């Protein structure tokens, strides 16, 4: 793969993602001691708050930081507008905090946190799709990135609907569409992204050229 150093984002852009991610992981680890495991399956307020704080503040934050670095490697083109990543992490961080507090204390602020987080995700998706447009030749890995981000887009739409429903802004059967949100984001985006990226990254660590 012919990767130019000019495609690599500056360290000051990437660092906040990993700093926030590690801090969130530390906080959520300690918060686990306050969660009643016997009632975790019921998706009560504390469980939903912890899950979103962990998944958005740690998992997605780390993925976004990694994607800022890996997209040029996988697509073999520069970012369409890498500076957009400077506004993604503060929006995602604020949105995550509002959602966590909304689930735990005050459901009325859930839509606000959801919208702020949605804007962060939308900026990420927009930048990624515009970068993919620059690709001249598609392969399996690039296609997997495209498909994963399409799943993420629909997962976000469902997530906003769920936030509105949980806060009481609209009348929906929250638990009937909850699985769609989980499958679209965790299976559709996270798992496909990891599998697609692995086809590029594993040969690098194994010092081989490609899968046979």
Stretches found by the model and what they are:
Residues 1-212:
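Hydrophobic alpha-helical transmembrane segments of multi-pass integral membrane proteins
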């Amino acid at each position: 793969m012919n990767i130019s150093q000019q495609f690599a984002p500056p360290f000051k852009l990437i660092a906040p993602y990993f700093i926030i991610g590690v801090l969130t992981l530390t906080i959520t680890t300690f918060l686990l001691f306050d969660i009643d495991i016997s009632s975790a399956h019921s998706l009560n307020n504390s469980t939903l708050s912890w899950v979103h704080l962990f998944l958005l503040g740690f998992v997605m934050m780390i993925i976004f930081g990694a994607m800022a670095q890996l997209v040029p490697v996988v697509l073999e083109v520069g970012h369409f507008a890498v500076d957009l990543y400077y506004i993604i992490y503060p929006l995602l961080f604020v949105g995550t905090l509002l959602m966590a507090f909304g689930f735990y204390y005050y459901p009325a602020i859930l839509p606000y946190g959801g919208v702020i987080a949605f804007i962060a995700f939308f900026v990420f998706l927009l930048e990624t799709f515009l970068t993919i447009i620059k690709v001249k030749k598609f392969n399996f890995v690039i296609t997997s990135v495209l498909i994963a981000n399409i799943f993420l887009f629909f997962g976000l739409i469902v997530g906003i609907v769920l936030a509105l429903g949980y806060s009481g802004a609209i009348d929906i059967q929250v638990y009937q569409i909850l699985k769609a949100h989980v499958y679209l984001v965790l299976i559709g985006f996270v798992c496909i992204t990891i599998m697609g990226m692995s086809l590029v990254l594993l040969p690098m660590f194994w010092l081989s050229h490609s899968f046979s």
